[in-house]
Amino acid sequence: MASQQKVVEIYTDGACSGNPGVGGWGAILRWNGHERELYGGNAHTTNNQMELMAAICALKALKEPCLVDLYTDSVYVRNGISKWIEGWKKNNWRTASKSPVKNMELWQTLEDACSCHAVRWHWVKGHAGHPENERADALARKAIAQYRENGRFPT
């Protein structure tokens, strides 16, 4: 009998104090009545980089191939991975206007993190009262606060 893939909901957010500046990311993973919170950050980063890192770290935390519904308030992340990335690759990591793609390494890492999962990307409006998006945002801000307090991010 074939085993059924685990269905996981992931909620992500990134935050940056200054852009660039100190940034944090947060993610909530939910499956079969269980939840796990993840967060981290970088001392010199951008909001878009933290949005990407939230999705990357959440997907990498999965221990087996899963069916994933990933919710982000970043149109940049959702469109980048679901609409733009194939064109970027065909154009040798250049945009339609021939500029180098920003955050290329993170996009490549995100694509790799998605490769063993079936990921459905969903956009949610940020700062609009969506409970899990608000929690992911709070985790991202917690990472920034911890860095400011003791000079390091959670591990």
From Swiss-Prot:
Uppermost EC category: hydrolase
Taxonomic placement: Bacteria, Pseudomonadati, Pseudomonadota, Alphaproteobacteria, Hyphomicrobiales
GO biological process per UniProt: DNA replication, removal of RNA primer
Organism: Bartonella tribocorum (strain CIP 105476 / IBS 506)
GO cellular component, one term: cytoplasm
Chain sites annotated for binding Mg(2+) 2: 13, 137
Domain RNase H type-1: 4-145
Gene that produces this protein: rnhA
Keywords: Cytoplasm, Endonuclease, Hydrolase, Magnesium, Metal-binding, Nuclease
InterPro entries tied to this protein: RNase_H, RNaseH-like_sf, RNaseH_domain, RNaseH_sf, RNaseHI
SUPFAM superfamilies for this protein: Ribonuclease H-like
Keyword Hydrolase: yes
Catalytic activity entry: Endonucleolytic cleavage to 5'-phosphomonoester
UniProt record similarity statement: Belongs to the RNase H family.
Domain of life: Bacteria
Main location: cytoplasm
Gene Ontology MF terms: magnesium ion binding; nucleic acid binding; RNA-DNA hybrid ribonuclease activity
Cofactor dependency: Mg(2+)
Protein name as catalogued: Ribonuclease H
Function of the molecule: Endonuclease that specifically degrades the RNA of RNA-DNA hybrids.
Note on how the cofactor is bound: Binds 1 Mg(2+) ion per subunit. May bind a second metal ion at a regulatory site, or after substrate binding.
Subunit (UniProt): Monomer.
Compartment(s): Cytoplasm
Listed Pfam families: RNase_H
EC number: 3.1.26.4
Record-listed Mg(2+) 1 binding positions: 13, 51, 73
